[in-house]
Structure formats: structure tokens, C-alpha cells
């Protein structure tokens, strides 16, 4: 059986390396994309020769050619858009331009990624974007995550309809809040506004879960790897909510 490729954008982030490791375990070669070439080489040293580093800024159109040129001469089974956003604060203090920047990274970046691999996609290839809880449950403390991830949910549905005739499926994975450095920055903004200690606010956020837990990177990687199964066709265009029981809406 010939080898195939997965492309993971944001591979040096909180989720990216864990996802890449899981996809390598599933037998795929992985092209890992990030801006920082030095950090990419560190990841490559940990993941081995089936990991192919690609230094590119997914917020810029030049990433399309950079990713395309890094692809091995084989089919692309999956792309994963796992780009993180800088914390810009709540909606009362965030710079207006930060909202546009978030949309460029989340939505523009996903479009660039898919266009880079379009000619290598095959039947049942998976186009996966990582959104987040705040795209569905708005918080005044997470302006960029809320706006960027809400827009991404719409884009994934558009991708689903656009690529469906080719039997290629698009998926949104919406974790969180996840136990990462970024979440601590969100908690710090909430704590400052509420006049509470950071640790107290962090535990309050944990208690928002029905099971008193934050989502972990390993759980996100598990869900994404599951989408490689042929049965995942049934999830075309849908959102996998990995929020550890936080959502209240029906």
C-alpha cells in the first residue's frame, strides 16, 4: 500500500505536535507547517524522518506555494488547520484590527491550506479545521477566538458543499476550553476584570464543565485521527464539540 500525506498547520502549537504524532502513528507522512523554522526543526527531531518541516506564514498567500512545494509525491489524506490566535483581550478592550487578523488566520489560513493541496486530494480526503468553544458560546473575555471560530464554522460548511461532489469531506473540531497557556491568558483577563486571583478564576472555568475538566490535546488528536476512518463520511460538514460538557444550547 502506497504511503499518503497529512498536512498539519500550527504544528509547533499546543495541539499541533500531538496531532502530528498521532497521524504518524496512523501511518501517514506529515508535513508540519509553522512560521518558526527553529521550532520546526526541534519538532522534526522528536518526530522522526516521516515528519517534513515546512516554514510558512499561513496568514500570507505565499504559504500556498510553500506548502505545495513541500508535499511528497503522493496523495494527501488529511489536512489539519490548527492555528492558534494571539490573545487580544475581551471585546471591551480588543483592538478592532485584531478581529480581522483573527479571521485572516482562521478562515483565510484554512482556504490557503486547502488550495495548497487541492491537486493531491483523493476520494475520502479530510479537510479538518480546529475551531473552538467560544465560537459557539460567546464570551466577552475572548473576542478574537469568538469571532474567528464562529466564522470558521461557516467556512467549513461552505467547504463541505464545495468539495462534497469529489467525495472529499470537511470537518470542524471545536475543543475547549483546553488546558493550554492560551487559556491561562484568557483566565488572567477574566480574573483582572473580576478582581479575583488567577488560580481562583482558572478553577471557576474548570467548573464550567459538566465533568469538571478541561479538554486535553491528546483528546483532540484522538478525535482528528478518528476522522481518517471511512465511516467518518457521515460527519461531513459537521462540528465535533470536544468541550467536556460545557455547552448549554440544544
Task: Identify the residue ranges that each predicted region occupies.
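Rossmann-fold cofactor-recognition segment
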Residues: 47-62
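Catalytic Tyr-X3-Lys loop
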Residues: 85, 92-112, 128, 145, ...
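Short, small/polar-rich loop/turn modules that mediate ligand/substrate recognition or access, typified
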Residues: 164, 169, 235-237
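Conserved NAD(P)H cofactor-binding loop of Rossmann-fold oxidoreductase domains
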Residues: 82-88, 245
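Short C-terminal tail/terminal secondary-structure segment
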Residues: 231-250
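Amphipathic alpha-helical dimer-interface segment in Rossmann-like NAD(P)H-dependent oxidoreductases
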Residues: 69-73, 104-125, 160-161, 229
